[in-house]
Swiss-Prot record:
GO terms for molecular function: DNA-binding transcription activator activity, RNA polymerase II-specific; DNA-binding transcription factor activity; DNA-binding transcription factor activity, RNA polymerase II-specific; RNA polymerase II cis-regulatory region sequence-specific DNA binding; sequence-specific DNA binding; sequence-specific double-stranded DNA binding; zinc ion binding. Induction: By PHA/PMA or by serum. This is Early growth response protein 4. Residues 29-101, 383-411, 436-466 are annotated as: Disordered. Residues 395-404 have a biased composition (Gly residues). Its main location: nucleus. Belongs to the EGR C2H2-type zinc-finger protein family.
Length: 589
């Protein structure tokens, strides 16, 4: 913003006129010289001296020239002695050629602290132009603190419009005031409520309803009937969307756990605006396990109409749907029980201490534990010594259900968990009802005393072999091998019959496979095959490390262990030398 020095300011230092462009200020023949002489009726001003280092022309100021003082436009000139006559050579100096008229503005001149930018065009002292009005006061708020700022701005705009040339401007060096502060926008981008109601949501709701196309918010007289804590929730004849109940109201009757649903149906004189009524059903809780409602006034049909029923369209003009003006009809007190009661009800549902008596067969069906039923002939002749499977619990007493088939035996049956079966009836089946604070829900049986000793090993050998399972494992064992060795002293069993037959040759000593070269007999064909390789010299198995070949795979495996030991010793040796940290190994060396 261009600012001029006002009246009463101290006399500035002789200004240095910097050439911006075109004819220099003060040069003979310039437009400023001609217009100034015509306006004041005086001769042209003396040419101001220039600093040698400010212009690349290298011109030196004249010794007799005196720098004129700064004069505002319209200010009467003080009486002064006539300027000294200039030499004829200087007065008749021709106009500078167009090639030498170039801009002399340097970027370093902007960094000078005492440089004041002034837009002075060639018509600085000319009369103000009639076409351009004066600058309004609101357009120059930053220059009001400076004397004569408004006049200067008006002069600057008028002179610029009169001359039409914005190229000529100069810097006036000297003590200059601090530049005016920059303009800043102090507006607000948020919505301010009425000072009397700083947190009134009506203004925001009216704004949003205008955007979303909803009905306007009711007046403050309708909201006056509500409590102060209910202010964030809409009420009135135009409250189409219900809000959640107040969680922090003084009376806990309006609790956040509605029993069936809550409604907001204030519509007086305008039944067409009462459009929707929310019906929120409680979560899916079995009616048999749900706590009774807090009041008989609750309609069970509407309470359990459906899980979270959607918005239902009400009949327009139906009686009882619309209330009085500004009446916020919440659900009755029975639908909003005390929050403490509701918490107890929820705890009683989620963590029931007592449940209604339900038959045990409902919770535990009869066929729930019929796992791996066995036929009597599956285990052979020694099946009477094997333990039985788990007895499915029945609903009435200790008697077994009809879902499982068990082996007939005079000895007490054992379950897969190592427990006595309920068919033995040695001890009653414990229930949750026998435990204090519980009711008749069937529970797993309590571990009984240790089981009786097992039958003889002979009967067990003729049945299923223990295999990898422990001696106390009585699971159905689908991985058990069905073909056991018939020899009493042998406990081997096999999954395939050919494996059992090959095993029986060990007991009988039968060797049906004979070598044709040496007539040696073998009980297994693979043994004969490897034996023949000793005669033929065939060695199909080679070592991966040293390349040594072997006739049998087990020989190669035994030989590979030698290399593993050598590699371990070599790594220990390299680790002692410090090479192991570099990632070297025996194989790479």
């Amino acid at each position: 913003m261009a600012v001029a020095r006002g009246v009463g300011s101290p006399e500035p230092a002789p200004p240095q006129l910097y050439k911006w462009g075109g004819c220099g200020l003060g040069e003979p023949g310039s437009a400023l010289e001609r217009r100034g002489a015509a306006a004041r009726g005086r001769c042209g001003r003396a040419r101001a001296p220039r600093l040698p280092d400010s212009f690349p022309r290298g011109e030196c100021p004249k010794p007799g020239a005196r720098a004129p003082r700064s004069v505002r436009c319209g200010e009467p000139l003080p009486p002064a002695s006539p300027p000294p006559a200039r030499p004829q050579a200087q007065r008749a100096r021709p106009r500078a050629p167009h090639s030498r008229r170039r801009a002399m503005l340097h970027l370093s001149e902007f960094s000078e602290p005492d440089a004041l930018l002034v837009k002075s065009t060639e018509g600085c002292c000319a009369e103000p132009s009639a076409e351009l009005p004066r600058l309004p006061a609101r357009d120059a708020p930053a220059a009001t603190g400076y004397p004569g700022a408004g006049d200067f701005l008006s002069w600057a705009l008028n002179s610029c419009g009169a001359s039409g040339d914005l190229a000529d401007s100069c810097f006036l060096e000297g003590p200059a005031p601090t530049p005016p502060p920059g303009l800043s926008y102090s507006g607000s981008f948020f919505i301010q409520a009425v000072p009397e109601h700083p947190h009134d949501p009506e203004a925001l709701f009216n704004l949003m309803s205008g955007i979303l196309g909803l009905a306007p918010f009711p007046g403050p007289e309708a909201a006056a009937s509500r409590s102060p804590l209910d202010a964030p929730f809409p009420a009135g004849s135009d409250a189409l969307l219900p809000g959640p109940p107040d969680l922090y109201s003084p009376d806990l009757g309006a609790a956040p756990f509605p029993e069936a649903f809550w409604e907001a149906s204030p519509c007086a004189g305008a039944p067409s605006q009462c459009l929707y009524e929310p019906q929120l059903s409680p979560p899916d809780v079995k009616p048999g396990l749900r706590a009774p409602p807090a009041s008989p006034a609750l309609d069970a049909v509407s309470a359990f109409k459906g899980p979270y029923a959607p918005w239902e369209l009400l009949s327009v003009g139906a009686p009882g749907n619309c209330g009085s003006q500004g009446d916020y009809q919440a659900a009755p007190e029975a639908r909003f029980p005390v929050i403490g009661t509701k918490i107890e009800d929820l705890l009683s549902i989620s963590c029931p201490a007592e449940l209604p008596a339900v038959p045990a067969n409902r919770l535990y069906p009869s066929g729930a534990y019929d796992a791996f039923p066995l036929a009597p002939g599956d285990l052979g002749e020694g099946a009477e010594g094997l333990p039985g499977l788990l007895t499915p619990p029945s609903g009435e007493g200790g008697s077994s259900g009809d879902g499982g088939e068990f082996l007939a035996s005079t000895q007490p049956q054992l379950s897969p968990l190592g427990l006595r079966s309920a068919a033995a009836a040695d001890f009653p089946k414990p229930l949750v009802a026998d435990i204090p604070g519980s009711s008749g829900v069937a529970a797993p049986p309590v571990p009984p005393p240790p089981p009786t000793p097992f039958p003889q090993a002979k009967a067990r050998r003729k049945g299923r072999r223990g295999g990898k399972c422990s001696t106390r494992c009585f699971c159905p064992r689908p991985h058990a091998k069905a073909f056991a060795c018939p020899v009493e002293s042998c406990v081997r069993s096999f999954a395939r019959s050919d494996e059992l037959n090959r095993h029986l040759r060990i007991h009988t000593g039968h060797k049906p496979f004979q070598c044709r070269i040496c007539l040696r007999n073998f009980s297994r064909s693979d043994h004969l095959t490897t034996h023949v390789r000793t005669h033929t010299g065939e060695k199909p198995f080679a070592c991966d490390v040293c390349g040594r070949r072997f006739a049998r795979s087990d020989e190669k495996k035994r030989h590979s262990k030698v290399h593993l030991k050598q590699k371990a010793r070599a790594e220990e040796r390299l680790k002692g030398l410090g090479f192991y940290s570099l990632g070297l190994s025996f194989a790479s060396l």
